[in-house]
Amino acid sequence: MASNDKGMAPSLGSPWASQMGPWDAILKAVKDQLPSLDSDSPLSDYGEEELFIFQRNQTSLIPDLSEELAEDPADGDKSRAWVAAAEESLPEPVLVPAELATEPGCRQNTRTKDASSQEGRDPGRPFESSGEVSALLGMAEEPPRWLEGDLGSLSFNTKGSQGPPWDPQAEATLSCHEGDPKAEPLSTASQESVNRRALRQERRKMIETDILQKVTRDACGPTSSDKGGVKEAPCHAAESAPRSKMPLVEPPEGPPVLSLQQLEAWDLDDILQSLAGQEDNQGNRAPGTVWWAADHRQVQDRMVPSAHNRLMEQLALLCTTQSKASACARKVPADTPQDTKEADSGSRCASRKQGSQAGPGPQLAQGMRLNAESPTIFIDLRQMELPDHLSPESSSHSSSDSEEEEEEEMAALGDAEGASPSSLGLRTCTGKSQLLQQLRAFQKGTAQPELPASKGPAGGRAQAPEDTAGSRTGRKQHMKLCAKGQSAQARLPRGRPRALGDVPEPGAAREALMPPLEQL
Protein backbone atom coordinates (compact mmCIF):
# COMPACT_ATOMS: atom_id res chain seq x y z
CA MET A 1 0.00 0.00 0.00
CA ALA A 2 2.84 2.37 0.83
CA SER A 3 4.60 1.50 -2.48
CA ASN A 4 1.48 2.25 -4.48
CA ASP A 5 1.12 5.56 -2.72
CA LYS A 6 4.75 6.39 -3.49
CA GLY A 7 4.17 5.52 -7.13
CA MET A 8 1.20 7.81 -7.34
CA ALA A 9 2.98 10.65 -5.64
CA PRO A 10 4.67 12.21 -8.77
CA SER A 11 1.40 12.35 -10.73
CA LEU A 12 -0.83 13.60 -7.91
CA GLY A 13 1.17 16.56 -6.73
CA SER A 14 2.23 17.77 -3.33
CA PRO A 15 -1.17 18.00 -1.52
CA TRP A 16 -2.25 14.39 -2.11
CA ALA A 17 1.23 13.02 -1.39
CA SER A 18 1.31 14.77 1.93
CA GLN A 19 -2.18 13.45 2.75
CA MET A 20 -1.53 9.71 2.25
CA GLY A 21 1.09 9.43 4.98
CA PRO A 22 -1.27 9.98 7.94
CA TRP A 23 -4.02 7.86 6.35
CA ASP A 24 -1.64 4.93 6.13
CA ALA A 25 -0.93 5.19 9.85
CA ILE A 26 -4.63 5.48 10.58
CA LEU A 27 -5.45 2.34 8.61
CA LYS A 28 -2.75 0.34 10.37
CA ALA A 29 -3.96 1.47 13.78
CA VAL A 30 -7.64 0.82 13.08
CA LYS A 31 -7.27 -2.44 11.13
CA ASP A 32 -7.43 -4.64 14.24
CA GLN A 33 -10.44 -2.83 15.62
CA LEU A 34 -12.64 -3.09 12.55
CA PRO A 35 -15.15 -5.97 12.90
CA SER A 36 -15.86 -8.62 10.33
CA LEU A 37 -19.16 -10.03 9.11
CA ASP A 38 -19.15 -13.00 11.50
CA SER A 39 -17.81 -11.28 14.60
CA ASP A 40 -20.01 -8.34 15.50
CA SER A 41 -22.69 -8.04 12.86
CA PRO A 42 -26.41 -8.48 13.62
CA LEU A 43 -26.39 -11.72 11.57
CA SER A 44 -24.68 -13.51 14.45
CA ASP A 45 -26.82 -11.86 17.11
CA TYR A 46 -30.13 -13.48 16.20
CA GLY A 47 -29.48 -16.22 18.75
CA GLU A 48 -30.34 -16.24 22.41
CA GLU A 49 -27.52 -13.94 23.48
CA GLU A 50 -28.14 -10.27 24.10
CA LEU A 51 -27.30 -7.55 21.60
CA PHE A 52 -23.66 -6.55 21.77
CA ILE A 53 -24.46 -2.86 22.04
CA PHE A 54 -25.84 -3.38 25.53
CA GLN A 55 -22.53 -4.85 26.71
CA ARG A 56 -20.55 -1.72 25.89
CA ASN A 57 -20.08 1.32 28.04
CA GLN A 58 -22.83 3.78 27.23
CA THR A 59 -20.48 6.77 27.49
CA SER A 60 -18.54 5.57 24.43
CA LEU A 61 -21.60 5.26 22.20
CA ILE A 62 -21.60 8.98 21.38
CA PRO A 63 -18.02 10.32 21.48
CA ASP A 64 -17.43 13.80 22.81
CA LEU A 65 -15.34 15.77 20.30
CA SER A 66 -15.49 19.08 22.15
CA GLU A 67 -12.03 18.56 23.66
CA GLU A 68 -10.47 17.87 20.26
CA LEU A 69 -12.13 20.92 18.79
CA ALA A 70 -10.75 23.03 21.61
CA GLU A 71 -7.21 21.58 21.32
CA ASP A 72 -6.81 21.85 17.50
CA PRO A 73 -8.34 25.13 16.41
CA ALA A 74 -5.66 25.62 13.72
CA ASP A 75 -6.69 22.65 11.61
CA GLY A 76 -9.20 24.82 9.83
CA ASP A 77 -6.39 27.01 8.47
CA LYS A 78 -4.55 23.93 7.22
CA SER A 79 -7.65 22.75 5.42
CA ARG A 80 -8.11 26.15 3.82
CA ALA A 81 -4.51 26.16 2.59
CA TRP A 82 -4.98 22.61 1.42
CA VAL A 83 -8.04 23.52 -0.67
CA ALA A 84 -6.28 26.63 -2.01
CA ALA A 85 -3.36 24.52 -3.23
CA ALA A 86 -5.77 22.21 -5.01
CA GLU A 87 -7.47 25.15 -6.69
CA GLU A 88 -4.16 26.48 -7.99
CA SER A 89 -3.49 23.17 -9.77
CA LEU A 90 -6.83 23.26 -11.62
CA PRO A 91 -6.63 24.72 -15.18
CA GLU A 92 -10.33 25.62 -15.34
CA PRO A 93 -13.22 26.09 -12.88
CA VAL A 94 -14.89 23.06 -11.35
CA LEU A 95 -18.63 22.45 -11.25
CA VAL A 96 -19.68 21.42 -7.74
CA PRO A 97 -22.89 19.36 -7.35
CA ALA A 98 -25.85 20.89 -5.48
CA GLU A 99 -25.70 18.25 -2.73
CA LEU A 100 -22.06 19.06 -1.94
CA ALA A 101 -22.46 22.83 -1.92
CA THR A 102 -23.39 22.84 1.78
CA GLU A 103 -20.52 20.57 2.89
CA PRO A 104 -17.02 22.11 2.67
CA GLY A 105 -15.35 18.74 3.30
CA CYS A 106 -16.74 17.29 0.08
CA ARG A 107 -15.40 20.18 -1.98
CA GLN A 108 -11.86 19.00 -1.28
CA ASN A 109 -12.45 15.50 -2.63
CA THR A 110 -14.28 16.74 -5.72
CA ARG A 111 -11.56 19.13 -6.72
CA THR A 112 -8.88 16.53 -6.07
CA LYS A 113 -10.79 14.22 -8.40
CA ASP A 114 -10.77 16.81 -11.18
CA ALA A 115 -7.06 17.41 -10.68
CA SER A 116 -6.28 13.74 -11.05
CA SER A 117 -8.35 13.48 -14.23
CA GLN A 118 -6.60 16.49 -15.76
CA GLU A 119 -3.12 15.17 -15.04
CA GLY A 120 -3.62 11.95 -16.99
CA ARG A 121 -5.03 9.49 -14.51
CA ASP A 122 -7.41 6.87 -15.79
CA PRO A 123 -10.92 8.25 -15.16
CA GLY A 124 -12.52 4.81 -15.33
CA ARG A 125 -10.45 3.40 -12.50
CA PRO A 126 -12.68 4.68 -9.69
CA PHE A 127 -15.75 3.36 -11.47
CA GLU A 128 -14.26 -0.13 -11.66
CA SER A 129 -14.01 -0.34 -7.92
CA SER A 130 -17.29 1.42 -7.28
CA GLY A 131 -19.01 -1.93 -6.77
CA GLU A 132 -16.65 -2.79 -3.95
CA VAL A 133 -17.13 0.63 -2.40
CA SER A 134 -20.92 0.33 -2.52
CA ALA A 135 -20.67 -3.15 -0.97
CA LEU A 136 -18.56 -1.79 1.85
CA LEU A 137 -20.98 1.07 2.38
CA GLY A 138 -23.87 -1.39 2.47
CA MET A 139 -22.00 -3.45 5.06
CA ALA A 140 -21.39 -0.32 7.11
CA GLU A 141 -25.05 0.56 6.88
CA GLU A 142 -26.18 -2.88 8.08
CA PRO A 143 -24.14 -3.04 11.30
CA PRO A 144 -24.08 0.54 12.61
CA ARG A 145 -23.23 -0.72 16.09
CA TRP A 146 -19.52 -1.26 15.44
CA LEU A 147 -19.30 2.24 14.02
CA GLU A 148 -20.70 3.66 17.24
CA GLY A 149 -18.48 1.52 19.44
CA ASP A 150 -15.22 2.34 17.62
CA LEU A 151 -15.92 5.93 16.70
CA GLY A 152 -13.97 7.21 19.68
CA SER A 153 -10.79 5.39 18.62
CA LEU A 154 -11.17 6.57 15.03
CA SER A 155 -11.50 10.19 16.05
CA PHE A 156 -8.56 9.81 18.41
CA ASN A 157 -6.29 8.40 15.67
CA THR A 158 -7.23 11.06 13.14
CA LYS A 159 -5.89 13.67 15.48
CA GLY A 160 -2.47 13.66 13.89
CA SER A 161 -3.68 13.91 10.29
CA GLN A 162 -3.51 17.04 8.20
CA GLY A 163 -7.23 17.06 7.54
CA PRO A 164 -9.69 18.23 10.18
CA PRO A 165 -10.49 15.37 12.63
CA TRP A 166 -14.11 16.41 12.95
CA ASP A 167 -14.64 16.23 9.21
CA PRO A 168 -17.41 13.64 8.63
CA GLN A 169 -15.94 12.87 5.22
CA ALA A 170 -13.10 10.96 6.90
CA GLU A 171 -15.41 8.09 7.85
CA ALA A 172 -16.49 7.35 4.29
CA THR A 173 -12.97 7.85 2.96
CA LEU A 174 -11.63 5.38 5.50
CA SER A 175 -14.17 2.75 4.49
CA CYS A 176 -13.23 3.18 0.82
CA HIS A 177 -9.52 2.79 1.55
CA GLU A 178 -10.22 -0.32 3.55
CA GLY A 179 -11.87 -2.06 0.60
CA ASP A 180 -9.27 -1.09 -1.99
CA PRO A 181 -6.37 1.29 -1.27
CA LYS A 182 -6.02 2.16 -4.96
CA ALA A 183 -9.68 3.05 -5.35
CA GLU A 184 -10.34 6.71 -4.73
CA PRO A 185 -13.52 7.81 -2.91
CA LEU A 186 -13.90 10.89 -5.09
CA SER A 187 -16.24 9.31 -7.63
CA THR A 188 -18.89 8.36 -5.05
CA ALA A 189 -18.99 11.58 -3.03
CA SER A 190 -22.69 12.18 -3.51
CA GLN A 191 -23.58 8.60 -2.60
CA GLU A 192 -21.34 8.80 0.47
CA SER A 193 -23.07 11.93 1.74
CA VAL A 194 -26.48 10.28 1.38
CA ASN A 195 -25.27 7.14 3.11
CA ARG A 196 -23.64 9.16 5.87
CA ARG A 197 -26.86 10.99 6.58
CA ALA A 198 -28.73 7.70 6.63
CA LEU A 199 -26.17 6.30 9.06
CA ARG A 200 -26.56 9.27 11.36
CA GLN A 201 -30.34 9.02 11.32
CA GLU A 202 -30.19 5.31 11.96
CA ARG A 203 -27.75 5.83 14.80
CA ARG A 204 -29.96 8.43 16.43
CA LYS A 205 -33.00 6.20 16.01
CA MET A 206 -31.13 3.23 17.42
CA ILE A 207 -29.98 5.25 20.41
CA GLU A 208 -33.54 6.36 21.08
CA THR A 209 -35.07 2.92 20.62
CA ASP A 210 -32.43 0.50 21.90
CA ILE A 211 -30.72 2.39 24.69
CA LEU A 212 -33.78 4.11 26.12
CA GLN A 213 -35.93 1.01 25.78
CA LYS A 214 -33.15 -1.02 27.39
CA VAL A 215 -33.44 1.16 30.48
CA THR A 216 -37.20 0.70 30.62
CA ARG A 217 -36.92 -3.05 30.02
CA ASP A 218 -34.36 -3.35 32.80
CA ALA A 219 -36.76 -1.53 35.08
CA CYS A 220 -39.71 -3.75 34.19
CA GLY A 221 -37.70 -6.96 33.73
CA PRO A 222 -37.85 -8.34 37.34
CA THR A 223 -41.59 -7.80 37.53
CA SER A 224 -42.48 -9.08 34.06
CA SER A 225 -40.36 -12.24 34.35
CA ASP A 226 -42.76 -13.76 36.89
CA LYS A 227 -45.88 -13.49 34.80
CA GLY A 228 -45.54 -15.40 31.50
CA GLY A 229 -46.30 -14.31 27.99
CA VAL A 230 -48.58 -11.40 28.83
CA LYS A 231 -45.79 -9.33 30.34
CA GLU A 232 -43.13 -10.49 27.86
CA ALA A 233 -45.03 -9.14 24.87
CA PRO A 234 -44.06 -5.42 25.27
CA CYS A 235 -40.36 -6.23 25.78
CA HIS A 236 -40.34 -8.59 22.81
CA ALA A 237 -41.91 -5.88 20.68
CA ALA A 238 -39.26 -3.43 21.88
CA GLU A 239 -36.48 -5.84 20.86
CA SER A 240 -37.94 -6.52 17.44
CA ALA A 241 -38.53 -2.83 16.74
CA PRO A 242 -34.87 -1.85 16.02
CA ARG A 243 -34.38 -4.96 13.88
CA SER A 244 -37.33 -4.13 11.67
CA LYS A 245 -36.50 -0.38 11.82
CA MET A 246 -40.08 0.46 12.78
CA PRO A 247 -41.08 2.90 15.54
CA LEU A 248 -42.47 1.52 18.77
CA VAL A 249 -46.21 1.73 19.28
CA GLU A 250 -46.71 -0.05 22.61
CA PRO A 251 -44.66 1.88 25.23
CA PRO A 252 -47.75 3.74 26.54
CA GLU A 253 -49.21 0.37 27.57
CA GLY A 254 -46.31 -0.29 29.94
CA PRO A 255 -47.37 1.73 33.01
CA PRO A 256 -50.92 0.26 33.17
CA VAL A 257 -49.48 -3.27 33.01
CA LEU A 258 -47.06 -2.48 35.80
CA SER A 259 -49.78 -0.89 37.91
CA LEU A 260 -52.11 -3.87 37.45
CA GLN A 261 -49.36 -6.29 38.39
CA GLN A 262 -48.49 -4.25 41.45
CA LEU A 263 -52.16 -4.23 42.44
CA GLU A 264 -52.31 -8.02 42.13
CA ALA A 265 -49.28 -8.33 44.39
CA TRP A 266 -50.92 -6.28 47.16
CA ASP A 267 -52.63 -7.87 50.13
CA LEU A 268 -56.00 -6.19 50.08
CA ASP A 269 -57.03 -7.49 53.50
CA ASP A 270 -54.06 -5.86 55.18
CA ILE A 271 -54.67 -2.65 53.25
CA LEU A 272 -58.30 -2.53 54.34
CA GLN A 273 -57.38 -3.19 57.96
CA SER A 274 -54.66 -0.55 57.91
CA LEU A 275 -57.01 2.00 56.36
CA ALA A 276 -59.67 1.23 58.95
CA GLY A 277 -57.10 1.59 61.72
CA GLN A 278 -55.90 4.90 60.30
CA GLU A 279 -59.45 6.20 60.17
CA ASP A 280 -60.02 5.20 63.80
CA ASN A 281 -56.89 7.10 64.80
CA GLN A 282 -57.43 10.20 62.65
CA GLY A 283 -61.22 10.38 62.58
CA ASN A 284 -61.40 10.76 58.80
CA ARG A 285 -63.52 8.61 56.49
CA ALA A 286 -61.56 6.10 54.46
CA PRO A 287 -61.72 6.76 50.67
CA GLY A 288 -63.35 4.55 48.08
CA THR A 289 -64.81 1.17 48.89
CA VAL A 290 -63.28 0.97 52.37
CA TRP A 291 -65.75 3.38 53.97
CA TRP A 292 -68.24 0.67 54.96
CA ALA A 293 -65.60 -1.34 56.87
CA ALA A 294 -64.37 1.75 58.67
CA ASP A 295 -67.93 2.80 59.57
CA HIS A 296 -68.64 -0.67 60.90
CA ARG A 297 -65.61 -0.47 63.15
CA GLN A 298 -66.56 3.01 64.31
CA VAL A 299 -70.07 1.83 65.19
CA GLN A 300 -68.64 -1.04 67.23
CA ASP A 301 -66.22 1.28 68.99
CA ARG A 302 -69.03 3.67 69.83
CA MET A 303 -71.37 0.94 71.08
CA VAL A 304 -68.97 -0.41 73.70
CA PRO A 305 -68.38 2.84 75.64
CA SER A 306 -71.98 3.98 75.17
CA ALA A 307 -73.33 0.70 76.63
CA HIS A 308 -70.88 0.94 79.51
CA ASN A 309 -71.85 4.52 80.27
CA ARG A 310 -75.51 3.66 80.03
CA LEU A 311 -75.08 0.77 82.47
CA MET A 312 -73.23 2.97 84.94
CA GLU A 313 -75.97 5.57 84.71
CA GLN A 314 -78.57 2.91 85.42
CA LEU A 315 -76.60 1.74 88.45
CA ALA A 316 -76.33 5.25 89.81
CA LEU A 317 -80.05 5.83 89.23
CA LEU A 318 -80.87 2.56 90.99
CA CYS A 319 -78.80 3.54 94.00
CA THR A 320 -80.61 6.86 94.28
CA THR A 321 -84.02 5.25 93.88
CA GLN A 322 -83.17 2.66 96.54
CA SER A 323 -82.30 5.36 99.05
CA LYS A 324 -85.55 7.20 98.27
CA ALA A 325 -87.75 4.09 98.17
CA SER A 326 -86.47 2.80 101.50
CA ALA A 327 -88.20 5.71 103.26
CA CYS A 328 -91.66 5.01 101.84
CA ALA A 329 -91.50 1.28 101.01
CA ARG A 330 -93.16 0.03 104.18
CA LYS A 331 -96.75 1.09 104.76
CA VAL A 332 -99.11 0.44 107.61
CA PRO A 333 -102.16 -1.82 106.97
CA ALA A 334 -105.34 -0.06 105.89
CA ASP A 335 -107.38 -1.06 108.94
CA THR A 336 -104.91 0.47 111.43
CA PRO A 337 -106.39 3.51 113.25
CA GLN A 338 -104.94 6.97 112.73
CA ASP A 339 -103.87 7.40 116.36
CA THR A 340 -101.92 4.15 116.25
CA LYS A 341 -100.08 5.36 113.15
CA GLU A 342 -99.16 8.60 114.88
CA ALA A 343 -98.02 6.74 117.98
CA ASP A 344 -95.75 4.47 116.02
CA SER A 345 -94.35 7.14 113.67
CA GLY A 346 -91.36 7.88 115.92
CA SER A 347 -90.25 4.29 116.19
CA ARG A 348 -90.73 3.79 112.43
CA CYS A 349 -88.56 6.79 111.59
CA ALA A 350 -85.84 5.53 113.92
CA SER A 351 -85.94 2.06 112.44
CA ARG A 352 -85.86 3.49 108.90
CA LYS A 353 -82.81 5.62 109.67
CA GLN A 354 -80.94 2.70 111.15
CA GLY A 355 -82.04 -0.04 108.78
CA SER A 356 -82.25 1.81 105.46
CA GLN A 357 -78.62 1.01 104.67
CA ALA A 358 -78.40 -2.31 106.46
CA GLY A 359 -81.45 -4.01 105.02
CA PRO A 360 -82.26 -2.95 101.43
CA GLY A 361 -82.89 -6.56 100.45
CA PRO A 362 -86.71 -6.74 100.88
CA GLN A 363 -87.25 -3.27 99.39
CA LEU A 364 -85.06 -4.15 96.41
CA ALA A 365 -86.91 -7.43 95.94
CA GLN A 366 -90.24 -5.58 95.90
CA GLY A 367 -88.89 -3.13 93.34
CA MET A 368 -87.63 -5.96 91.17
CA ARG A 369 -90.97 -7.70 91.30
CA LEU A 370 -92.55 -4.60 89.85
CA ASN A 371 -90.08 -4.84 86.95
CA ALA A 372 -90.93 -8.34 85.79
CA GLU A 373 -87.80 -9.30 83.84
CA SER A 374 -84.96 -7.43 85.48
CA PRO A 375 -81.55 -8.77 84.33
CA THR A 376 -79.50 -7.70 87.36
CA ILE A 377 -79.88 -8.28 91.11
CA PHE A 378 -78.00 -5.90 93.41
CA ILE A 379 -77.04 -7.05 96.89
CA ASP A 380 -75.44 -4.73 99.43
CA LEU A 381 -72.35 -6.46 100.85
CA ARG A 382 -71.17 -3.64 103.08
CA GLN A 383 -70.59 -4.29 106.76
CA MET A 384 -72.83 -2.28 109.04
CA GLU A 385 -72.50 -1.74 112.78
CA LEU A 386 -75.29 -2.83 115.07
CA PRO A 387 -77.10 0.27 116.45
CA ASP A 388 -76.96 0.51 120.24
CA HIS A 389 -79.89 2.84 120.72
CA LEU A 390 -82.37 0.71 118.81
CA SER A 391 -84.04 -0.95 121.77
CA PRO A 392 -84.32 2.17 123.96
CA GLU A 393 -86.01 4.16 121.19
CA SER A 394 -88.35 1.36 120.26
CA SER A 395 -89.32 0.73 123.88
CA SER A 396 -89.76 4.37 124.92
CA HIS A 397 -93.22 4.90 123.41
CA SER A 398 -95.43 3.01 125.87
CA SER A 399 -94.52 1.83 129.37
CA SER A 400 -97.04 -1.00 129.32
CA ASP A 401 -95.57 -2.70 126.25
CA SER A 402 -91.84 -2.22 126.96
CA GLU A 403 -91.43 -5.51 128.83
CA GLU A 404 -93.13 -7.49 126.07
CA GLU A 405 -91.00 -5.87 123.39
CA GLU A 406 -87.79 -6.68 125.25
CA GLU A 407 -88.86 -10.29 125.66
CA GLU A 408 -89.67 -10.53 121.94
CA GLU A 409 -86.32 -9.02 120.96
CA MET A 410 -84.42 -11.42 123.21
CA ALA A 411 -86.34 -14.36 121.79
CA ALA A 412 -85.64 -13.18 118.24
CA LEU A 413 -81.91 -12.80 118.96
CA GLY A 414 -81.84 -16.27 120.51
CA ASP A 415 -83.58 -17.76 117.49
CA ALA A 416 -81.20 -15.96 115.13
CA GLU A 417 -78.16 -17.25 117.01
CA GLY A 418 -79.57 -20.76 116.93
CA ALA A 419 -80.30 -20.54 113.22
CA SER A 420 -77.05 -18.88 112.16
CA PRO A 421 -75.09 -22.16 111.82
CA SER A 422 -77.80 -23.55 109.59
CA SER A 423 -77.85 -20.36 107.52
CA LEU A 424 -74.25 -20.98 106.51
CA GLY A 425 -75.47 -23.94 104.51
CA LEU A 426 -77.56 -21.63 102.31
CA ARG A 427 -74.53 -19.92 100.79
CA THR A 428 -75.04 -21.93 97.64
CA CYS A 429 -78.40 -20.24 97.01
CA THR A 430 -78.62 -17.42 94.56
CA GLY A 431 -79.30 -13.87 95.62
CA LYS A 432 -82.68 -13.85 93.96
CA SER A 433 -83.91 -16.93 95.84
CA GLN A 434 -82.72 -15.47 99.13
CA LEU A 435 -84.51 -12.22 98.46
CA LEU A 436 -87.68 -14.08 97.55
CA GLN A 437 -87.48 -16.09 100.77
CA GLN A 438 -87.11 -12.92 102.82
CA LEU A 439 -90.01 -11.28 101.04
CA ARG A 440 -92.26 -14.32 101.51
CA ALA A 441 -91.41 -14.54 105.20
CA PHE A 442 -92.04 -10.83 105.66
CA GLN A 443 -95.42 -10.99 103.93
CA LYS A 444 -96.48 -13.97 106.05
CA GLY A 445 -95.39 -12.14 109.18
CA THR A 446 -97.50 -9.11 108.32
CA ALA A 447 -100.55 -11.16 107.27
CA GLN A 448 -100.80 -13.40 110.39
CA PRO A 449 -101.69 -10.74 113.01
CA GLU A 450 -104.61 -9.43 110.94
CA LEU A 451 -106.53 -12.74 111.01
CA PRO A 452 -107.76 -12.55 114.67
CA ALA A 453 -108.85 -8.96 114.21
CA SER A 454 -111.12 -9.79 111.28
CA LYS A 455 -112.83 -12.67 113.13
CA GLY A 456 -113.80 -10.69 116.24
CA PRO A 457 -117.46 -9.56 116.33
CA ALA A 458 -116.72 -6.57 118.49
CA GLY A 459 -115.12 -4.71 115.61
CA GLY A 460 -114.02 -1.24 116.75
CA ARG A 461 -113.00 -1.60 120.41
CA ALA A 462 -111.27 -4.97 120.22
CA GLN A 463 -109.60 -4.08 116.92
CA ALA A 464 -107.43 -1.29 118.20
CA PRO A 465 -105.20 -3.32 120.57
CA GLU A 466 -104.79 -6.04 117.98
CA ASP A 467 -103.90 -3.55 115.22
CA THR A 468 -101.42 -1.92 117.50
CA ALA A 469 -99.87 -5.29 118.22
CA GLY A 470 -99.75 -6.03 114.45
CA SER A 471 -97.97 -2.78 113.70
CA ARG A 472 -95.50 -3.43 116.50
CA THR A 473 -94.93 -6.91 115.15
CA GLY A 474 -94.03 -5.53 111.69
CA ARG A 475 -91.66 -3.02 113.23
CA LYS A 476 -90.02 -5.66 115.39
CA GLN A 477 -89.64 -8.02 112.45
CA HIS A 478 -87.60 -5.42 110.59
CA MET A 479 -85.31 -5.00 113.59
CA LYS A 480 -84.98 -8.75 113.94
CA LEU A 481 -83.77 -9.03 110.32
CA CYS A 482 -81.08 -6.43 110.94
CA ALA A 483 -79.94 -8.11 114.16
CA LYS A 484 -79.91 -11.51 112.53
CA GLY A 485 -77.71 -10.24 109.66
CA GLN A 486 -75.23 -8.67 112.07
CA SER A 487 -74.98 -11.80 114.22
CA ALA A 488 -74.37 -13.96 111.14
CA GLN A 489 -71.59 -11.62 109.95
CA ALA A 490 -69.96 -11.75 113.38
CA ARG A 491 -69.76 -15.54 113.21
CA LEU A 492 -68.11 -15.70 109.73
CA PRO A 493 -64.37 -16.66 109.76
CA ARG A 494 -61.71 -14.00 108.99
CA GLY A 495 -64.28 -11.24 108.95
CA ARG A 496 -65.54 -12.14 105.48
CA PRO A 497 -68.52 -9.94 104.51
CA ARG A 498 -71.81 -11.70 104.14
CA ALA A 499 -74.91 -10.73 102.22
CA LEU A 500 -77.80 -9.58 104.31
CA GLY A 501 -80.07 -11.83 102.31
CA ASP A 502 -78.73 -15.02 103.97
CA VAL A 503 -81.62 -16.42 105.99
CA PRO A 504 -82.09 -19.70 107.83
CA GLU A 505 -84.32 -22.52 106.72
CA PRO A 506 -88.04 -21.80 106.21
CA GLY A 507 -88.97 -23.38 109.54
CA ALA A 508 -86.36 -21.47 111.49
CA ALA A 509 -87.21 -18.25 109.64
CA ARG A 510 -90.91 -18.67 110.46
CA GLU A 511 -90.09 -19.26 114.13
CA ALA A 512 -87.82 -16.22 114.20
CA LEU A 513 -90.19 -13.85 112.40
CA MET A 514 -93.47 -15.00 114.04
CA PRO A 515 -93.52 -14.86 117.81
CA PRO A 516 -96.00 -17.05 119.67
CA LEU A 517 -99.57 -15.79 119.90
CA GLU A 518 -99.46 -16.01 123.70
CA GLN A 519 -96.91 -13.17 123.77
CA LEU A 520 -99.27 -10.92 121.81
Curated annotation (Swiss-Prot):
One of its GO terms (biological process) is outer dynein arm assembly. Disulfide bonds: none annotated. GO terms for molecular function: dynein complex binding. One of its GO terms (cellular component) is cytoplasm. Keywords: Cytoplasm, Phosphoprotein. The keyword Cytoplasm applies. Residues 111-125 have a biased composition (Basic and acidic residues). The modification Phosphoserine is found at residues 161, 351. The keyword Cytoplasm applies. Residues 420-437 have a biased composition (Polar residues). Residues 93-202, 217-256, 328-366, 388-520 are annotated as: Disordered. Residues 401-410 have a biased composition (Acidic residues). Pfam families: DAAP1. It is found in: Dynein axonemal particle; Cytoplasm. Expressed in respiratory ciliated cells (at protein level). PANTHER family: CHROMOSOME 16 OPEN READING FRAME 71, DYNEIN AXONEMAL ASSEMBLY FACTOR 8. In cyliated cells, dynein axonemal particle-specific protein required for deployment of ODA to the axoneme. Interacts with outer dynein arm (ODA) subunits. This is Dynein axonemal assembly factor 8. It comes from Homo sapiens (Human).
